[in-house]
Amino acid sequence: MLKAKILFVGPCESGKTVLANFLTESSDITEYNPTQGVRILEFENPHVTSNNKGTGCEFELWDCGGDPKFESCWPALMKDSHGVVIVFNADIPSHLKEIETWYSCFVQQQFLQNTQCLLIAHHKPGSGSDKDNPALAPPLNKLKLVHSNLEDDPEEIRMEFIKYLRSIINSVSESRDREEMSIIT
């Protein structure tokens, strides 16, 4: 069975925990409580299987606290990660600048490909869902950007996340196949 580790990162109060719970079908949290360090959610998704082998896949979703005081822990969180989801609150202008730092630390410095990264512009309930694409600085503007609004269209973000999980599993599977071939030859 293939396993993949995916990090949920981004600024404080961007909606990472709410999205993580929704996408992994974990418990609902009704009041805001900042994540201290990291929460690890383990789950399987029946819609995601390994490359034409039909074998199941296990995921670890690491819901990382957005407070900069945890920056010293980031190297440990990043170790052996296969993908990074950067979540930001689309209604807070300062988040656009902050996600550049998250991208630099968690994607560029880890030498992950842009295909291993997903950018989610999260809209909190009652905020209205302005689907206009925010003005993202390069290289963020090359990433896949998805809007999420759990109030208006929860299934859209679920379907986009499943597509993302499939691409991560394909990447993990191809990497494993290359490794096995290098051992054989």
UniProtKB/Swiss-Prot annotation:
Any single Pfam family the record assigns to this protein: Roc
Keywords in alphabetical order: Cell projection, Cilium, GTP-binding, Nucleotide-binding
InterPro entries from the UniProt entry: P-loop_NTPase
UniProt-annotated binding residues for GTP: 10-17, 63-67, 123-126
Any one GO CC term of the record: cilium
Domain of life of the organism encoding this protein: Eukaryota
Family: Belongs to the small GTPase superfamily. Rab family.
Self-association and partners: Component of the IFT complex B, at least composed of IFT20, IFT22, IFT25, IFT27, IFT46, IFT52, TRAF3IP1/IFT54, IFT57, IFT74, IFT80, IFT81, and IFT88. Interacts with IFT88. Interacts with CFAP61.
Function of the molecule: Small GTPase-like component of the intraflagellar transport (IFT) complex B.
UniProt name for this protein: Intraflagellar transport protein 22 homolog
Provenance organism: Bos taurus
